[in-house]
Structures are given as C-alpha cells and as structure tokens.
Amino acid sequence: VYVVTNLPGSGKNEEEQLASGLHWHTDIEFEPVPLSTSMFYVQCVPISREHQNGTWVPDVRPADGFYHPDSNKDLNSRRFDLPLNGETAYADTASAFEDLPKEKQKELEKTQVRRRLRVSDAGWLTPLVYRNPRTGRQSLHSPVWASRGKNVAPVQIDGFSETQTREYLDELEAHVLQQKYRYDHLHQPGDVTIWSNFATLHNAPPVKSKICSPEDARLMYRISCKGEPSYHLPRKDTDEWLAANISPPYQSNI
C-alpha cells in the first residue's frame, strides 16, 4: 500500500509549498514484472478554491530540465495541460492505438522496447503493444521515452539510437495526450478508482505539497497488482513466483 498525501508529518511545521505535476507514466513499468493494475482508495480531498482562477492551485509548470530540452513545443503543451483541483489525469492508450493507421499499428506490434531501472543495467526487451488476453484489445504500454526524468533510465527501442528512440516515442506520446483520449478524475472521499497500467498513462497533478489548512488536505491509498492479470479464479500463485516477484511480508492464502 502506497500512501499519497500532502499531510505534514511530526517534524517542523514548514511554510506552504507548491509542486508541479509529474511525468506522464505507468506504475513500475521499468521492472521485469510490471504492475498490471493500480487503484486509489480516497480518504480526503482538498476543498479549497482560493486561487484567483477559482482552482485549488495555480498552473505550476515544471522547472527547466524536467523534460528533455529538445522536446517539441506541441508535446510539452499537452504534457503541461494538467488539472488544478487535485484530480488525477489519465490518457487512454488503447483508443489511441486503435485510431492509428493500420500500417502504423503493424509497425508498432513488432516494436520491442528495452526497459531498465538504471543506466548501468542491461535491461530487458518487452513489447510496446500489449494485447489483453481476455478481450483481444491492444494498447500502447507506456509509450514514453523518459517517464521518471532523471530518476529512471530512459527506454530504448531495439535497433534504434537514443535520439531515434526519443523522437519516435515523443511522437507517440503527443498522439496519446490529445484531449480526446484524456480523462481527469476529480476524487471524492470514498472513491475507489481502478485503472490498467497496460492501457493508460496517468499523471499526478500540481499540488500543495506542504499545507497549513485542513481544507487543503489530500490523502489517498494506492494499491497495485503485479504481473499478468489472472482471468481464472482462484489465482494460484506459486511459492517460487512469490519469492521472485513479491517483497515480504506478502502472503497468499490460496
């Protein structure tokens, strides 16, 4: 369980701070067994709308260097178009894939991406296009060159240089981030929001990262499922699979 909050801890009370939105990403796609599904259980959301434009926060842009300096302006304008009331922004990579020309779809179906956590890692090749084994619907799995900025090594398309990879994936990201594929979810207490990491990108909004008023409080719990989704019940996780892919103290009662 991952806690998403801006509630202050027990340390020194600091002045209110603003944080820009993050990179568009999927959760933990850089591991050999990625997260398939994520969900938010919402406890508390901001109710303040004190900014002059009637939103919780102003339009806070990332600092220089957040994205690659050669990223085109059209792409960056779509990246920075984020909600300002504490919503989570989503983009539908399944519909975006379906709208591509058939020849482009065939090209992408053959595309392999090398993902890795650190630049020094050899990494592993994974398909850029994911096919849902139950519905057969295809989607783009994390079509982003550098989804964690400097924190995680950029991906590389098999057979492409770094520059070719960035330009190719920037074009796909710009396609996916069109408004017709976007959905911004305004959380309410008690909401359970579930999404597929294979079929969406998402982005955390600009937030007040240090708060001075309870009206600005934001508290959600993120729960995630790892590995290929099971479409048959009961799911039978073997001890070997759990030992290789899940950190203690997880246990399966199946």
Segments (PLM) and residue ranges:
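Non-heme Fe(II) oxygenase catalytic core, chiefly the N-lobe of the double-stranded beta-helix
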Residues: 1-191, 198-254
